[in-house]
């Protein structure tokens, strides 16, 4: 893994910082694990924008990732590491002893030729997947299930991890990178170690066009709009918006709590750090 700062041969290259990983596969992805990934430009079936700042970008195939890791007791060899345009983490193509291939999120430190395994009896080693009740307290994990059997939902992006800090009956307590401490059912599965490609946060795209290649459109300030488009819009000349900052739909947008799922508040031991 190398961090490369490009020479300023043009204004668009001046600030580019690239993450170069020589271990990534340079060929095409494994075709049986690809799916069509159509773009909708952030529009729904009525043609109305439901997600802002989405549109354009390079065509992509979706890589089918094994987030459940339910193939127990069968060891798998890591064939290669690959880039995935759909996420910040890299992915690993693994070949099971019975001949099946699957993609998994590539943990930190894993290389081609390494062996990974899942199941209750899997050893405590980076890349192995076990129920949380079988993982020692103090261990670092990623790809954590919130509901047993649903598949990993927590700590899936580049450099992400959670730490097991306590075990109490049917639950284990995790400390997330945000500082939040929450309880998770101990029957849910997690993968040992942390997600690789942690240098992802150091990259600099360098120009607006590189963001457009990724399918992200510009964010326009509300005060630059007309009154019909945003509560901050309109006015003669430049204005401050004339009110406390709100979203395009009038919801206070700075420091206003919008969490609605009160039924799961009981699982949050401590809120995240501000």
UniProtKB/Swiss-Prot annotation:
Coiled coil: none annotated. It holds the Pfam family Ribosomal_L2. Gene3D superfamilies: 2.30.30.30, Nucleic acid-binding proteins, Ribosomal protein L2, domain 3. Residues 223-274 are annotated as: Disordered. GO terms for molecular function: rRNA binding; structural constituent of ribosome; transferase activity. GO terms for biological process: cytoplasmic translation. Signal peptide: none annotated. GO terms for cellular component: large ribosomal subunit. InterPro entries: NA-bd_OB-fold, Rib_uL2_dom2, Ribosomal_uL2, Ribosomal_uL2_bac/org-type, Ribosomal_uL2_C, Ribosomal_uL2_CS, Ribosomal_uL2_dom3, Ribosomal_uL2_RNA-bd_dom. Belongs to the universal ribosomal protein uL2 family. Part of the 50S ribosomal subunit. Forms a bridge to the 30S subunit in the 70S ribosome. This is Large ribosomal subunit protein uL2.
């Amino acid at each position: 893994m190398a961090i490369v700062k490009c020479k300023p041969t043009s204004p668009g290259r001046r600030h580019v910082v690239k993450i170069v990983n020589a271990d990534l596969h340079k060929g095409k992805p494994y075709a049986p694990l690809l799916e069509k990934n159509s773009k909708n430009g952030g529009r729904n079936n009525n043609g109305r924008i439901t997600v802002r700042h989405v549109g354009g970008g390079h065509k992509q195939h979706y890589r089918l990732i094994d987030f459940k890791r339910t193939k127990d007791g069968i060891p798998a060899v890591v064939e290669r590491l690959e880039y995935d345009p759909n996420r910040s983490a890299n992915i690993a193509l693994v070949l099971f002893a019975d001949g099946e291939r699957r993609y998994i999120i590539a943990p930190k430190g894993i290389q081609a030729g390494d062996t990974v395994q899942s199941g209750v009896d899997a050893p405590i080693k980076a890349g192995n997947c076990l129920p949380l009740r079988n993982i020692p307290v103090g261990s670092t994990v990623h790809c954590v299930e919130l509901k047993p059997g649903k598949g990993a939902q927590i700590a899936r992006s580049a450099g992400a991890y959670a730490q097991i800090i306590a075990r109490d009956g049917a639950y284990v307590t995790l400390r997330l990178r945000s500082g939040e401490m929450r309880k998770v059912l101990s029957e849910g599965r997690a993968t040992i170690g942390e997600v690789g490609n942690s240098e992802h946060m150091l990259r600099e795209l360098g120009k607006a066009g590189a963001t457009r290649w990724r399918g992200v459109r510009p964010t326009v300030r509300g005060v630059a709009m007309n009154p019909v488009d945003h509560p901050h819009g309109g006015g003669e000349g430049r204005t401050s918006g004339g009110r406390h900052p709100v979203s395009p739909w009038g919801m206070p947008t700075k420091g206003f709590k919008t969490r609605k799922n009160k039924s799961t508040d009981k699982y949050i031991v401590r809120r995240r750090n501000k």
